[in-house]
């Protein structure tokens, strides 16, 4: 192997170049790479934090939706209950009114029956008096007596 001055000169230039790169170029390059790695790590951490916050927000939204659904269902149930109570009250009022009308009609019918009976009693009394008058005016004959009774039956 042939070692000459060019080889040593190249070695000196190489070490000088290496020292310049190590002293002036390498530290800013490493610093830039470290900053870039830190930015990437911070970005990933921020993304994870954002993802966690998004999941938390989604959970809160789901919880709020569930509460809204529950509240809506409760309101619907309350409205249905109020409607049922109102319907029951209307039915009770209608039944009470119907019972009152029926009672009034029964009382009126009872009064009409009573009036009709009184009227019939008066008419029967008048007819009985007439029949007795006619029987007393005529002589007692079985055939005439039967005819008068038949005539009274027809008038009643």
Swiss-Prot record:
Its main location: membrane. The keyword DNA repair does not apply. GO terms for cellular component: plasma membrane; proton-transporting ATP synthase complex. GO terms for molecular function: proton-transporting ATP synthase activity, rotational mechanism; proton-transporting ATPase activity, rotational mechanism. The keyword Transmembrane applies. Gene3D superfamilies: 6.10.250.1580. It comes from the Bacteria. It is found in: Cell inner membrane. It is a single-pass membrane protein. InterPro entries: ATP_synth_B-like_membr_sf (IPR028987), ATP_synth_b/b'su_bac/chlpt (IPR002146), ATP_synth_F0_bsu_bac (IPR005864), ATP_synthase_B_chain (IPR050059). Keywords: ATP synthesis, Cell inner membrane, Cell membrane, CF(0), Hydrogen ion transport, Ion transport, Membrane, Transmembrane, Transmembrane helix, Transport. It holds the Pfam family ATP-synt_B. The chain crosses the membrane at residues 7-27. F(1)F(0) ATP synthase produces ATP from ADP in the presence of a proton or sodium gradient. F-type ATPases consist of two structural domains, F(1) containing the extramembraneous catalytic core and F(0) containing the membrane proton channel, linked together by a central stalk and a peripheral stalk. During catalysis, ATP synthesis in the catalytic domain of F(1) is coupled via a rotary mechanism of the central stalk subunits to proton translocation. Component of the F(0) channel, it forms part of the peripheral stalk, linking F(1) to F(0). F-type ATPases have 2 components, F(1) - the catalytic core - and F(0) - the membrane proton channel. F(1) has five subunits: alpha(3), beta(3), gamma(1), delta(1), epsilon(1). F(0) has three main subunits: a(1), b(2) and c(10-14). The alpha and beta chains form an alternating ring which encloses part of the gamma chain. F(1) is attached to F(0) by a central stalk formed by the gamma and epsilon chains, while a peripheral stalk is formed by the delta and b chains. Belongs to the ATPase B chain family. This is ATP synthase subunit b. It comes from Cupriavidus metallidurans (strain ATCC 43123 / DSM 2839 / NBRC 102507 / CH34). The gene is atpF.
